[in-house]
Amino acid sequence: MDREKLIAEIEKLKEERNAIIMAHNYQLPEVQDIADFLGDSLELARKAVNVDAEVIVFAGVDFMAETAKILNPEKTVLLPAKTATCAMANMLQVEHILEAKRRYPNAPVVLYVNSSAEAKAHADVTVTSANAVKIVEKLDSNVVIFGPDKNLGSYVARVTGKRVIPVPPDGHCYVHRKFTVEDVERARRRYPNAKLMVHPECEPEVQERADIIASTGGMIRHAPEWNEWVVFTEREMVYRLSRLYPNIKFYPAREDAVCVGMKAITLESIYESLRDMKYRVEVPEEIAKKAKRAIERMLEMS
């Protein structure tokens, strides 16, 4: 099926199923183009609370689809590809959290939304890269258990002055770990007039050399402040920014900064997902109930 026919079939099935497509900023350009709603993790979570459609097709990775299901237990949530997983989310096991709680019984558990529903069920509050600093600042504790991203945790510690206990000790995003100081220096040489926008999942030494440190939603807000940017995050963010601001120049810091899990979602898989109503996302009720409290607390605090 050619692309135009595929898109027409998707639109037809969306109408028949009363479905919407929610997509993350790291999706393939052709998936971004057909999304009803496009955003970062926080924006997608906020949107998921107020969805009118009966079916949500989630063009993102598994933990994002789980969050949508937790917030909409009565709706059908579809993840078009079983391989749309997040390696970092899988690094955090419940036992890591329980062990940290034994060592720091009074410390609140703050979990990045890039975590499983099972892990979120043990959290006091969840955060995204967009609101982590704001939420940790509001917590009445100078010590927090934070996971799974160590780099986001160190950024939060640096900005808030609070002590962050990372769980697991070396949780990370393999895409953002690719970026190095050499990439920063190369970007400065190649694009001398550009500023650097860096995601807080990048290594601290990369963050320290940035002009701004921001979530993907933050990058969108900051972009109009300058006319040329090098983007230190997943490469598809350059497409998203370029569409929003056609008169501003954006360059990927690395062409190989690719999230394989995100790229598992294609137009074909979205079409098949709507056609066959697969793959349905389910979260056990007890886990969903506990995880929902942590997610809703995040939405209230941000």
Swiss-Prot record:
Iminosuccinate binds at H24, S41, Y112, V113, N114, S129, H199, P200, E201, T216. Its EC number is 2.5.1.72. [4Fe-4S] cluster binds at C86, C173, C259. InterPro entries: NadA, NadA_sf, Quinolinate_synth_type2. Pfam families: NadA. Belongs to the quinolinate synthase family. Type 2 subfamily. This is Quinolinate synthase. It comes from Thermococcus gammatolerans (strain DSM 15229 / JCM 11827 / EJ3). The gene is nadA.
